[in-house]
Design a protein with these regions (language model features):
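Boundary-flanking segments of nucleic-acid-binding domains in nuclear regulatory proteins
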Residues: 1-287
Length: 287
């Protein structure tokens, strides 16, 4: 049988044959995937060859059209003249980026001058600043529903947490995307409104106050404060009081990095919490 270009036959442990597909471009040997049928492996090679040498047909902005959805109408399918059947969308992104930018990544990243896109599907990508390139080129982003995360040293790390967005933070209350695009994780596009647990900013145009709530059996008002650091410390103090009065609950702790230990202690000792919270704790209603 004639050897097919770009195809290498190999064996599984049980002796069954399968076929690896690869291509060499700009001096780099690129694996395209493994296939059960040699013709499929060869077709993957042919698709890769067309992508790498047909920049007028294959472009990153047209990625979605190369992978039409299964329920796409026949009319729309007809327009998808460059449909990809054998390569994964991740591999197509990798090839397009290597062709256009001369940089090979193992992740589905397409590089622009000051930012890059990380593709999670043909029609969905995230935008990041270039300074995050090293991290995301070596960490695979996964999506479960609206939950975006990477595996980092065996731990799940949410994408949002890397940008100061706390777990359970509410969009447009605790943080916001300035351009309204919640796939754009460039630092200039993320505004953290409430960086501390239990602290809610109120007011507008720089005239802000900070309401503090603590959740026990529902939310209790700790107080309203003039600055965010005092509010964050008030939350910590309220949590400590809850523990002192026998509430066995793990409250998050606010860390205020710009205060010295002495400044923190001074504010902690002087800050007040609401009479209603103290009354609830001392009356035993928390039991």
């Amino acid at each position: 049988m004639k050897k097919l270009t770009g195809v290498f036959e190999t064996k599984k442990k049980n002796g069954q044959s399968y076929y690896r597909s690869s291509i060499t471009y700009k001096g780099r040997h690129i694996s395209l995937g493994s296939f059960d049928i040699s013709e499929d492996a060869h077709n993957a090679y042919l698709e890769a060859d067309k992508i790498l040498h047909s920049s007028d047909v294959y472009q990153i902005d047209l990625l979605e059209s190369y992978f039409p959805a299964a329920d796409t109408s026949p009319k729309k399918k007809k327009k998808s003249f460059a449909k990809i059947d054998f390569l994964s969308f991740e591999k197509v992104v990798i090839l397009l980026n290597f062709r256009d930018n001369d940089i090979y990544f193992h992740s589905p990243i397409y590089l622009y001058k000051n930012f890059f896109h990380y593709y999670l599907s043909p029609d969905y990508h995230l935008t990041f600043d270039k300074e995050d390139l090293f991290y995301y080129s070596s960490h695979k982003i996964m999506r479960r529903g609206n939950h975006l995360f990477v595996a980092d040293y065996g731990m799940q790390v949410t994408i949002a947490s890397r940008y100061g967005i706390r777990n359970f933070a509410v969009k447009d209350r605790d943080y916001r995307f300035i351009n309204q695009d919640d796939t754009d994780y460039r630092y200039s596009n993320i505004e953290i409104i409430n960086p501390y647990h239990g602290v809610l900013r109120e007011g507008s145009f720089g005239n802000y106050s900070y309401r503090v709530l603590i959740h026990i059996n529902g939310n209790y008002i700790v107080g309203i404060y003039d600055n965010i650091e005092t509010a964050a410390i008030a939350y910590n103090k309220a949590a400590d009081l809850c523990h002192q009065y026998g509430i066995n609950k793990k409250f998050p702790v606010n860390y205020i990095e710009n205060l010295s230990p002495k400044m923190y202690a001074d504010i902690y000792s002087s800050v007040s919490v609401s009479d209603s919270l103290i009354s609830m704790l001392t009356s035993g209603c928390n039991q």
